[in-house]
Amino acid sequence: MEKYFGEKQERFSFRKLSVGLVSATISSLFFMSVLASSSVDAQETAGVHYKYVADSELSSEEKKQLVYDIPTYVENDDETYYLVYKLNSQNQLAELPNTGSKNERQALVAGASLAAMGILIFAVSKKKVKNKTVLHLVLVAGIGNGVLVSVHALENHLLLNYNTDYELTSGEKLPLPKEISGYTYIGYIKEGKTTSESEVSNQKSSVATPTKQQKVDYNVTPNFVDHPSTVQAIQEQTPVSSTKPTEVQVVEKPFSTELINPRKEEKQSSDSQEQLAEHKNLETKKEEKISPKEKTGVNTLNPQDEVLSGQLNKPELLYREETMETKIDFQEEIQENPDLAEGTVRVKQEGKLGKKVEIVRIFSVNKEEVSREIVSTSTTAPSPRIVEKGTKKTQVIKEQPETGVEHKDVQSGAIVEPAIQPELPEAVVSDKGEPEVQPTLPEAVVTDKGETEVQPESPDTVVSDKGEPEQVAPLPEYKGNIEQVKPETPVEKTKEQGPEKTEEVPVKPTEETPVNPNEGTTEGTSIQEAENPVQPAEESTTNSEKVSPDTSSKNTGEVSSNPSDSTTSVGESNKPEHNDSKNENSEKTVEEVPVNPNEGTVEGTSNQETEKPVQPAEETQTNSGKIANENTGEVSNKPSDSKPPVEESNQPEKNGTATKPENSGNTTSENGQTEPEPSNGNSTEDVSTESNTSNSNGNEEIKQENELDPDKKVEEPEKTLELRNVSDLELYSLSNGTYKQHISLEQVPSNPNSYFVKVKSSSFKDVYLPVASISEERKNDKILYKITAKVEKLQQEIESRYKDNFTFYLAKKGTEETTNFTSFSNLVKAINQNPSGTYHLAASLNANEVELGPDERSYIKDTFTGRLIGEKDGKNYAIYNLKKPLFENLSGATVEKLSLKNVAISGKDDIGSLANEAQNNTKIKQVHVDGVLAGERGIGGLLAKAEQSSITESSFKGRIINTYETTAAYNIGGMVGHLTGDKALLTKSKATVAISSNTNTSDQTVGGLAGLVDRDAQIQDSYAEGDINNVKHFGRVAGVAGNLWDRTSGDVRHAGSLTNVLSDVNVTNGNAITGYHYNEMKVKDTFSSKANRVYNVTLVKDEVVSKESFEERGTMLDASQIASKKAEINPLILPTVEPLSTSGKKDSDFSKVAYYQAKRNLTYKNIEKLLPFYNKATIVKYGNLVNENSLLYQKELLSAVMMKDNQVITDIVSNKQTANKLLLHYKDDLSEKLDLKYQNDFAKLAEYSLGNTGLLYTPNQFLYDQTSIIKQVLPDLQKVDYHSEAIRKTLGISPNVKQTELYLEDQFAKTKQQLEDSLKKLLSADAGLASANPVTEGYLVDKIKRNKEALLLGLTYLERWYNFSYGQVNVKDLVLYHLDFFGKGNASPLDTLIELGKSGFNNLLAKNNVDTYGISLASQHGTTDLFSTLEHYRKVFLPNTSNNDWFKSETKAYIVEEKSTIEEVKTKQGLAGTKYSIGVYDRITSATWKYRNMVLPLLTLPERSVFVISTMSSLGFGAYDRYRSSDHKAGKALNDFVEENARETAKRQRDHYDYWYRILDDNAREKLYRNILLYDAYKFGDDNTVGKATEVADFDNPNPAMQHFFGPVGNKVGHNQHGAYATGDAVYYMGYRMLDKDGAITYTHEMTHDSDQDIYLGGYGRRSGLGPEFFAKGLLQAPDHPDDATITINSILKHSKSDSTESRRLQVLDPTTRFNNADDLKQYVHNMFDVVYMLEYLEGNSILKLDTNQKQQLLRKVTNEYHPDPDGNKVYATNVVRNLTVEEVERLRSFNDLIDNNILSSREYASGKYERNGYFTIKLFAPIYAALSNDIGTPGDLMGRRIAYELLAAKGFKDGMVPYISNQYEEEAKQKGKTINLYGKTRGLVTDDLVLEKVFNNQYHTWSEFKKAMYQERQDQFDRLNKVTFNDTTQPWQTFAKKTTSSVDELQKLMDVAVRKDAEHNYYHWNNYNPDIDSEVHKLKRAIFKAYLDQTNDFRSSIFENKK
């Protein structure tokens, strides 16, 4: 055959394309057959000529060259293809599509060798202009001469008008052959070349690639796509391809020859959609004619189009449709399969006849036919008998035939929608409206010509004519982790994807599967779901049928509606009907080749899902045996993607929608040859494309392996609504404006429309269904009422079959029950009438049946004296949902074998679940309770009080809350609050508790089993487990019993007793067994767990300290022993109780669903959360698309959150179209974001496509108009006033209780301002209203109005305390509305907010925020506590950020975290989440931190008003305004000042504890890692404050620091006039300020109080009799100033040589460099004492030279006094300094006499009593010669401090000072009989002589000996004194005179002079005496000391030679 020269038809016809309509007005242009060869751009375009030939025109020789496939790629510069068609019937021939008007048609008839009236042709040329691919598309209408072209070698006369020329780029995909009415395409002949079979097969796979023909509905003629974004039925035949760059390139659509002008498509999509909307549900059967009125298929042109077409006033154009069917023979082919190993030969498929069903749309104007066009063509392509020959390990797309495009033309049932969705971001549209393929799109590669070059990996991208990627309805393909779809890999486009006779199936717009532009159908595919079920396989079989074995069944029926996708949509079989080849082979192929998720639906597949249920597996299977699970049948509705999506393969790895036949997995290379392609999880794209192509060719190969037998119908699983995992059903009715729940019915109501059903689920939110009918039925001799609820598309699975609507039964309520009860209301009524009767439960009862008033205390008011038994006929029953105690009182009653489930009881007085009180030998046995009790007084899990009554073999499990602040006595217990009386017994029972309490006084008790056990009551053989968090430390709290003491009698004999009990309870502020210890307690065999955390804040030695409590621990067992001990004590097993009649727990079982894969069970569960309301078949369908590499396959999905970028979306209705991201939150805190794109609505659910996954997502809410609800409730809510009585009543407070400490007033106002938006979110997040109904809406209105105060309080509370972010994601809405975030999908945000608001004043107090989360929110969120929840959020949104870093970035507080300079410490401090971390968040969330409630206030600070300083041992908090004044005004000045000083303060605190770390041993060092609270005073200045602010602010103060932090934290600091004070676990600055320098010294003082006993003193504690102040001031505290003349250690301040005070400095310059270890400290003090002892010796000698009177003036005597302490001990010395008598003076003859007579200087030690625990310092230059000791106890404060330092100099800190000032030798003292009574206990008494003995090992017998030895040691070195130069104090200071000496004698002379002067002046006794000025001795000693201090570099060396 010769190539016809330049066959380029250039006839043009301007017309507006509407859906399925060829404009009647076409300007007829007749052109002669003058076709000059088109010019080729510099981009090497090639001329491709399509000549249309009837098979009758072929010679037998030519028929042998026929290739039964579709041309694929441009190979040469100039190519001619003869496209061969077979005539279906003469009738069909008679009318070819007419594009002209009636008059024009008459004119056109002339000269047509074929009676064709106006043939519509697309001429397409592609060119690249300014980097944009532009397709010039012209509709050429013409006939006759203009088209008659003589063919030299092969004549084509009959179809000459269809000839078309294209200018394409080499390697580009070829356009698809056109659909010609009355003809069936069977193959092609390429001029001058014979195509090998292998090529043919390859081409099949790529068939879809040619221009995508518009596929008209393949399934149902009458159905029209009405989705605005999807293009509607496109006139298939004409569109050759044009506007889509991709269409020519990657037309993976089955045969869509479509390609319509983008602009026209747009018009079609808009106009036609409106016109066709009415006909959406109409279904035309074959040959059925519909009148224009019946099918409101009215198409109109835009005025401008009408002008173009020559017609301005266009009459109404109507149409009807008819169906025609033609059979197609099959042939035999041999294919090379790259998927098969070389040498392997197999029969790929047996031949099978195909058939072609065409739906012709006949257009008429004024009842006269003006034209007709093929709306859709459903081709079951013949399956050629294909023999495969393996060439390598690649899959030959020959199998694609199976998936091959059935038909390039529109398949029947597919609605071709010309308009491409413009919003698709994937494609750029050029100025011509043609899509510009973006090179970045992975799906399509654009050649230099701008044409998409098919890439093996991007089969998915199909660009619509508009240049926008067509959306594929969520093609089954899954690209969660999909590899990029490769266009060439088109898995054979599943031929079967569209049902062959899809015409019957109305295709539904893309409701079901929103296409993700990037997904497989990427560009151009639009997936639409058919609303009707896909027809049987035979009809639906399309290329996709064969796709994967399982795929066809589900996918079939879906057709590509996109013009460009015209390639057969999945679901159609393009194979000729005649193919007799057996389908068995195709089945195999399909099975063998998993579909690549990315393929299949590649371009143009439009997945249309039928809404009917999938047929049973056996029915759905095609010849291939297995039907592609879900994809088959899905067809792309997009113009460019008409190709059928490949059916999903069931193979797990191919999550793709389209299943590829064996070869389908291969990608098609540019030349059309298949290349092996790894199974990408989703091969939908390729499959659909290629399979479509093959099918479209009609080649036998085209059949997909899964293709069903032509005679069988494979139905896509019908997508319906299904309510799964139903746990309970509640029936409500509206009567007289009141809603009532019905547990049963008495009769059939006359007005069922006033009823609705609340369907509760164990996994999903409540759904409200309107009741359609209620009828009475008799079953098993019982009268039941059948309740039927109806909602669009809702079905219910009953006995493995689905039935429309939702039904359930309620029992008939017995008019009266006397003994056996099945109704709670009847039970309550009966007992109230006769409280002494015997009652049995005959069913589990629901307490919701009875509503109580707000003031009612119990359900049964009178005292019950009868019997209540919860067991009947061997079944155990329960009462559910008690809101109040069941009984008020029990007296002599019996209650047994009863369970109380889900109690939620609250009350202001004493409460218990079963009863408030039981007395008079009431017996409670085998009663089990679970739930929550909250109150303000006594609480018991079963009883608040049990007097002379017993509880046996019973249990409680749940939460008990009473954090109410009151001084009233109360008792709280896990089982019973107060157990009292000698007959009272609790035995063989257990409690699992979480108790939150706030005991304030000793008569408030809390116990894991009982609070108070007194008057001989007993607890035996029982145990408690769980947690007790008691905020305050003054109550009696313990794991078993709070108190056993009988307060009534005060007699230990009548106390309560414990026998064989165990505590496995973590207790804060309490003990393990009992909360109060006394002698002779009646306890026996008590046990506790070592693993429990039992911390007690208590009063120890005059101080409040927090430490682990080992008191009342009983026998401590290892954690491993606890379980066995519990079993031994009490092997209690709880009974199994019957659920409520309306309850049930049935998880979704997917195993019975067709195509279920066991290994995907988790995946189905995950998809279930993405499609919460869809039926199981649909879930399985999409579950099979999930890639095995995807998190959706591997991890449990907890929740899905819609977002717009980084903003959480809750209001779905308002943001339906703007949502663009879906956050998937998986278990283990994993998450991922997928692109989200709205597709359409289905049954009031918004459907979205998910990224490139091919998956669907629907929010967990139905779309309904919330406006009416909001309008009704908003006014009422707006009227609520924060200070109203209604609010107070809701809070439960009296008028005189302030609401201040809620700190909600400002937020309350803000919340009201934003109420409308909040209500939209709330209604969206809450129960699903499946149908707009005044009854269900009224129920919500009523609930909101009735609880408006509580709702506002709850909403305000959460908006106030949870308004913070993680990065860019604010979590407020997650906390408020997305309660399912952590996997608990059935919580109601509305109910949660209301219950939170009703939880009471105490629960809503800001300071209780941590407990409030645990009490009111944790269970609703499915979490455990606040901090684990915050961490989970952080791990999801900021996985690479630590908790602390996130916290610091979010809070507006100024945080300084100062790590140690010691490397090992610094390293530990960087360990996040450990006790070593100095991260503020880590520390304040620690379990041992008292103020964990700081987290939320700090996270929500609105401004910078608070600073935080964190160092090794402390955590400080202060307000900026504490430093605000006229000098530091608000703003930058204040901020800079505070922040600079905060940094400096942090460094000082760091240095102080670095010092201590260096000198302590390892054990003590470990204890330095702690968390002492530092608080600056609540004193706030303003810009006018002078100096320091002094006024104390209270919690009402408006200061921002108080309002937003200090107040909400609730630490009511007691302010006083001190500089600061410590409590043992905290330091409070009062007069001093934390950031000042004196605040640093205060820090060392107060921290000594918090550190001495357990850390500084080695854990030995303070020595008995020494008060806390002894250890701070004058001993371990740093000196106040550098020039302090005291014996102290500077451990905190760094001084500088350049300081102004340097000349006077007497303390260590820099402690960080001076003290590197304990030896350095000892060396410093020892060397310092070298100077001290020497100077004291010199002074003493000088004084001895004076007369008696002078000596008396200069010296005093220190003595001891003894005063009894509170325990009567008279052993603690009090130092008294007094003047000497003459006699005493006269005894002072030698230096040692000064020591022996306890002499000290009068210069700085005034006469008087130095009280114990005083603030005294030891003077550096005022000698204490005395060695006064206390041999019967503890030294006085003066002598104690001095001797302590002397021991430090002599023996060091650990070996000298610590033994002296601690109780280190207490045990030795006790052994020696030295004891005292302390706090009722006998303790060892350490005496001075014992210390002397132990420290010096009997070296000295008296302290005088020790002291003399110390002086002597220095005297012995006087001759080696180092030379020193010092200020000459005898000269005026202005002279700066110096004196140098190395002679002690010279120093002695100087001292003599100085002493004499002082004696002469006699200043020592003056009141205003100042030694620095008035004492010559002081000045001399100071000068010498300072000189030696400097000379020795802070005493790093001695003042004596050769001594260090």
Swiss-Prot record:
Which residues lie in Basic and acidic residues bias regions?
276-296, 485-511, 574-591, 700-720
Q: Which GO terms describe its molecular function?
A: metalloendopeptidase activity; zinc ion binding
The cross-references to Pfam families, in alphabetical order and at most eight, read: G5, Gram_pos_anchor, Peptidase_M26_C, Peptidase_M26_N, YSIRK_signal
Task: Provide the protein's localization.
Answer: Secreted, Cell wall; Membrane
Q: Which residues form the G5 domain?
A: 314-393
Under catalytic activity, the entry for this protein gives: Cleavage of Pro-|-Thr bond in the hinge region of the heavy chain of human IgA
- Which residues are noted in the entry as Zn(2+)-binding? 1645, 1649, 1669
- UniProt PTM comment: The Gram-positive cell-wall anchor motif LPXTG is located in the N-terminal part, in contrast to such motifs in other known streptococcal and staphylococcal proteins. The protease could be cleaved by the sortase and anchored in the membrane via the two potential N-terminal transmembrane domains, whereas the propeptide located prior to the LPXTG motif would remain attached to the cell wall peptidoglycan by an amide bond.
Residue spans crossing the bilayer: 106-125, 132-154
One GO-annotated biological process of the protein: proteolysis
Task: Report residue spans for region: 3 X 17 AA approximate tandem repeats.
Answer: 419-469
Q: Which cofactor does it need?
A: Zn(2+)
Q: What family does this chain come from, according to its entry?
A: Belongs to the peptidase M26 family.
Q: Which residues carry this modification: Pentaglycyl murein peptidoglycan amidated threonine?
A: 99
Which EC class heads this enzyme's classification? hydrolase
What PROSITE patterns would the database entry show? G5, GRAM_POS_ANCHORING, ZINC_PROTEASE
Annotated sequence repeats reside at 419-435, 436-452, 453-469
UniProt propeptide residues: 43-99
- Output compositional bias ranges, type Low complexity: 682-699
What name appears for this protein in its UniProt entry?
Immunoglobulin A1 protease
- Gene Ontology CC entries for this record: extracellular region; membrane
Residue ranges annotated as motif LPXTG sorting signal: 96-100
**Compositional bias annotation for Polar residues:** 197-213, 235-246, 516-529, 538-572, 618-639, 648-681
- What EC number(s) is this enzyme filed under? 3.4.24.13
Keyword annotations from UniProtKB, A to Z: Cell wall, Hydrolase, Membrane, Metal-binding, Metalloprotease, Peptidoglycan-anchor, Protease, Repeat, Secreted, Signal, Transmembrane, Transmembrane helix, Virulence, Zinc
Q: How does the UniProt record describe the way this protein sits in the membrane? A: Multi-pass membrane protein; Peptidoglycan-anchor
